[in-house]
Each structure stands twice: as C-alpha cells, then as structure tokens.
C-alpha cells in the first residue's frame, strides 16, 4: 500500500509495481518534469490493483497499465487484471489513463470512473501494434470529465508503430469489449479515434452518453466491428455508425 505521499521530479516511471497482488495506491501526488518516460503510476502484470484519489502531472503517461512486451511476455503469460482507477485527477501528460503498448501478457477487467483529465495530450488511450500479441478486454470507463485535450479524447490504436502486414497469429494483438459511458469533453482536437488491424478489427465497443464540444476533426473508425452508439453528441450532432 502506498498512501498520502508526494513524489516530484522522477526521471523515469515513478510508481511501477510488477507481478504484484492486492495493491492499493491512494491519495498520492506525482509532479514530474515534462520529460519523456516520466510516467506516473504503471502497474505491470499485477492483479487486484486499486488506484484512487491521486493527483498526477507528468511528462509522459499519467497512469499506464502494462503486461510486458512481445515473445517473452507471451511466454510468461501474466496479465494485468482487476484494476480499478477512481477519483483521480490527471493534468499534463501524453495520456490520462493508458493501456499498452506493452500488453503482450494481456490486460483485462479494468474499471475507470469519476476521473478528471485537464490538459493531457489524450484522455483514454489503448495502444498496441503487430508483434505484441495479447488481448485487451473488458474495459469499463464511466463518469469522466475532460478539458483542454490536445489530441484525442478516446483513442484505441492497433497501429501504434508502423509494422508490415502479417497473417493473424499469436503475434496479433486484440482489443475487444470496451464500454465507455457518461463522458463529457470540452476543447479537444479529435473526439474519438479507433484504428484496428485488417486481420484483427477492434470489436464489441459500446459508447453511450458521451458529449463532446470543440472537436476540430471528425471521429475516426477504421477496421472496427460491432460498435454500438447511444447518445454520442459531438458539437451538437449525434454520431451514428
């Protein structure tokens, strides 16, 4: 358990539990320089993690959920699962809450609720690429407020790195079963972006009660299937698939 501490100017990942069970991170403040790799909280291949009431301002990702990369992590096969993130405030950073790109051991059963993102490059970000393998599934996001988002409010990207096409195999990452509801966004460049692989589309996505103002670009959906939208409003216009 880590509670009630303040950490400043970490030169690399600040809090990085690995292969742990029953982790509580509560009421901590992280204030790092705007430098690469100064992530805030990065649970990796952990189970039963509860992150709450934290205030994070960093130069990279604020909270990132990982499970190792490529063949070694696939052999170990230790997922990051049963993760709860609630009542946190994310300020500067590349992403507010991020999954990946190191997710080869899989990530599942993540709940993000009652969080504020103000000034991050992206809000919710799930990223991977060919060669990683692994599955990201059963992700729930609810009651999130975002403002001053420089890029995407929500981005799921299976082409995070440019890799040549290849047949579907254990090296192919999968994103599925992501539900986002009760999200309010003001001042963002791209509202929602989802890019799957030709051989592995992003699937089974539910977007509900999402209200976005200020998007300078349209929503982007490539190689996606079974997307359900209900009351998704961007600049006063309802978005439908």
Locate the predicted segments by residue.
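Extracellular/periplasmic carbohydrate-active domains that bind, remodel
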Residues: 1-241
């Amino acid at each position: 358990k880590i509670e009630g501490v303040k950490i400043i100017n970490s030169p690399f990942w600040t809090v990085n539990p690995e292969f742990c069970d029953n982790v509580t991170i509560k009421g901590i403040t992280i204030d790092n320089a705007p430098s690469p790799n100064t992530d805030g909280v990065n649970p990796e291949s952990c189970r039963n993690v509860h992150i709450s009431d934290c205030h994070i301002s960093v130069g990279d990702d604020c909270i990132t959920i990982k499970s190792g990369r490529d063949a070694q992590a696939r052999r170990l096969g230790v997922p990051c699962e049963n993760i709860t993130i609630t009542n946190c405030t994310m300020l500067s950073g590349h992403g507010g809450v991020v999954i990946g790109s190191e997710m080869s051991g899989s990530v599942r059963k993540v709940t993000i609720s009652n969080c504020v993102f103000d000034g991050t490059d992206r809000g919710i970000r799930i990223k991977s690429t060919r060669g990683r393998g692994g599955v990201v599934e059963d992700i729930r996001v609810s009651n999130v407020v975002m403002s001053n988002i420089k890029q995407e409010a929500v981005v799921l990207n299976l082409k995070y790195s440019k890799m040549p096409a290849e047949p579907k195999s254990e090296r192919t990452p999968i994103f599925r079963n992501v539900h986002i509801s009760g999200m309010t966004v003001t001042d963002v460049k791209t509202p929602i972006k989802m890019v799957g692989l030709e051989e592995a589309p992003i699937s089974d996505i539910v977007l509900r009660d999402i209200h976005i103002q200020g998007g300078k670009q349209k929503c982007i959906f490539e190689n996606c299937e079974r997307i359900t939208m209900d009351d998704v409003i961007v600049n006063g216009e309802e978005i439908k698939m």
